Amino acid sequence: MTTLVLGATGFIGSAVMNQLVSRDGNAAIGFVRTDSAAKQLSRNGIAATIGDINESASLRVAMSQASTVICCVSYVGDDEQQCVHVNEHGIRNIASIAAAVGVERLLYVSTAAVYGPGPFRDLPVNGAPLKPLSPASRTRALAEEFVRDAGGLVVRPHLVYGPGDRWFLPTLTRIVSRLDSVIDNGSAILSVVDVNLLVRSIYKLSTEQQFRYGSTLHVNEPVPRTVIDLLEHHARETNWTLPQSSIPRADAVKVAAQLGLDMHKIDMISLDHWFRSRLY
């Protein structure tokens, strides 16, 4: 079996590559955009191919070599044009070519952010209408449709932490530090997943005998965590200082507006985002 990983040097993609190469009987190819990224994989003994997900010729050649494609490509910034270019046009191209060349299994790593701001408590898959707010989440919701229509499997982790995380815990601690307080004693409940647990599940889902064609799954740790639990653990593991004060959410919203903080991120850490989930 040959597995092609798109976005093979990103946070999740690199962990997927490590998972694949640690397993016997699996040939793994990393699809990357630059020579430097290809050399990074080659130094670790991993085959690499260079291309762009919006450039059909290179993508077609790469996909023709694989029976399974795991797509870890995403743009999560605020540039709407880039969101459309990568998450909408790029993933549509991936889904189309996967179907055209006969890829047997296509798996796309999406996000539970497609549901919108919450609050959510024990939400099953598609237990609420999708109401994505940011350009990144809106275009990733569209990407999901392209993948499912091509018979692919969509996995929705929520907040991913672990080695290489440059978004979730850094954002959480930066906001709390700017506020110099936790919000509502850090009582908000969040679905989270360690990146190594996530990619282990991705591997199992991509190789199980009965592939879940055209399906969507929540893949997170089954028991959600409180914000204060996450912060206390981070403080113990690092030199970060956890503020000892707490403010109500309503006050935090006002202070955040004065500080110019992103209100979507305030919602993320002060409202429950608990998705009924499991690991595989």
Residue ranges, per PLM feature:
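N-terminal Rossmann NAD(P)H-binding glycine-rich loop of SDR-like oxidoreductase domains
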Residues: 3-23
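NAD(P)H-binding glycine-rich loop region in Rossmannoid oxidoreductase-like domains
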Residues: 36-89, 93, 97, 114-117
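Flexible, glycine-rich beta-alpha linker
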Residues: 116, 153-171
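Mid/C-terminal beta-alpha module of Rossmann-like enzyme folds, strongest
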Residues: 201-265, 277
